[in-house]
């Protein structure tokens, strides 16, 4: 008599879940670029600062860059940072800087052009030129930062990114710059009479269309190099931060899909702000919240069984200041143990 079909699978072992920490990221010494991102308000900055702290214990030099206009890393470390890498107080090898790529190229005011028909026509052509490659100003801002950072030879760079849309533009900036440069080369003769004036207004000095194109071309080798590194899982990874709620889970899935399209490696998720009720101190609100979060945690574990999913607790205090960041950072390597009844 034939054996039931299920018998051959009866003793098959369950798939072991991956370690629920960021140890794999800390231990991967080949990594040069680590992005931390997700929906707004989920604790990206706390997680990225904590990751940078742990990396500083095992790497020669670590730089954390905030590309979020909110610039929360100054709040997290309780220290003001600027566009220049600044040493974080209390560390010898951890540096931080804050940039706002969205400022890029400001819109030119009408007053500059007055009533002159020729200048008015020039403005229209400039607007047409800039609109031909949307995002070029932001992308060039990223490109300049990358050029500077590459020259500083930090052993690893952590990006505390802005909410998802900005993050995807950051990861796509090499493509945007190359496309924009190609478009500029096509129309440079058309806009040449006005390029010098535009450059003066943007603070780039005297420059004609050929010089501007040449200046952009100088950054292309760096941009292409960074682009290749971004797509190399040995050098780049992305850590998604979320909370156990529907919208955050949805945004995380969308982000992971977009990262796959960009060929960016990602195999770590941090689920932050989890509520763990204390059996000795019953709280109906906490228990209700825990029940909701548990439902979405189960979904995440089913959906992302090939990811390291770190679970971090909601704390009764802000994670602010070097000492608090230090303490919180240990949770990235040691799974949190919730209170249990005796």
UniProtKB/Swiss-Prot annotation:
Positions contributing to ATP binding: 39-40, 43-46, 245, 272, 313, 315
Top EC class of this enzyme: hydrolase
Annotated signal sequence range: none
Tagged with keyword Zinc: yes
Swiss-Prot/TrEMBL GO biological process terms: tail-anchored membrane protein insertion into ER membrane
Reactions catalysed: ATP + H2O = ADP + phosphate + H(+)
This protein's record includes keyword Methyltransferase: no
Location of the protein in the cell: Cytoplasm; Endoplasmic reticulum; Nucleus, Nucleolus
Molecular function as annotated in GO: ATP binding; ATP hydrolysis activity; metal ion binding
Primary location class: cytoplasm
One Gene Ontology cellular component annotation held by this UniProt entry: nucleolus
NCBIfam families with a match to the protein in the record: GET3_arsA_TRC40
Stated family: Belongs to the arsA ATPase family.
Protein name (record): ATPase GET3
């Amino acid at each position: 008599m034939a054996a039931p079909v299920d018998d051959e699978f009866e003793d098959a072992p369950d798939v072991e879940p991956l370690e629920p920490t960021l140890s794999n990221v800390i231990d991967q010494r080949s990594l040069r670029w680590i992005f931390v991102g997700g929906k707004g308000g989920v604790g990206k900055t706390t997680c990225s600062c904590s990751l940078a702290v742990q990396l500083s214990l095992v790497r020669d030099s670590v730089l954390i860059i905030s590309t979020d206009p909110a610039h929360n890393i100054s709040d997290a470390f309780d220290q003001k940072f600027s566009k220049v890498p600044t040493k974080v107080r209390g560390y010898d090898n951890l540096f931080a800087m804050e940039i706002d790529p969205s400022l890029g190229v400001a819109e030119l005011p009408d007053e500059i052009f007055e009533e002159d028909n020729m200048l008015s026509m020039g403005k229209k052509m400039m607007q047409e030129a800039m609109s031909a490659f949307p995002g070029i100003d932001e992308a060039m801002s990223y490109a300049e930062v990358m050029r500077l950072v590459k020259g500083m030879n930090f052993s690893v760079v952590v990006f505390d990114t802005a909410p998802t849309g900005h993050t995807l533009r950051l990861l796509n900036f090499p493509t945007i710059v190359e496309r924009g440069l190609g478009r500029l080369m096509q129309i440079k003769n058309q806009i040449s009479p006005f390029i010098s004036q535009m450059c003066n207004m943007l603070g780039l000095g005297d420059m004609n269309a050929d010089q501007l194109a040449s200046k952009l071309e100088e950054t292309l080798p760096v941009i292409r190099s960074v682009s290749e590194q971004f797509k190399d899982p040995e050098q780049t990874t992305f850590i998604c931060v979320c909370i156990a709620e529907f919208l955050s889970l949805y945004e995380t899935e969308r982000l992971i899909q977009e990262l796959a399209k960009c060929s960016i490696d990602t195999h770590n998720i941090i689920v932050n702000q989890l509520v763990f009720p204390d059996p000795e101190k019953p709280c109906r609100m906490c228990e209700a919240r825990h029940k909701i979060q548990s439902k979405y945690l189960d979904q995440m574990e089913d959906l992302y069984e090939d990811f390291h999913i770190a679970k971090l607790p909601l704390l009764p205090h802000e994670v602010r200041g070097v000492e608090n960041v230090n303490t919180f950072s240990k949770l990235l390597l040691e799974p949190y143990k919730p209170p249990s009844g005796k």
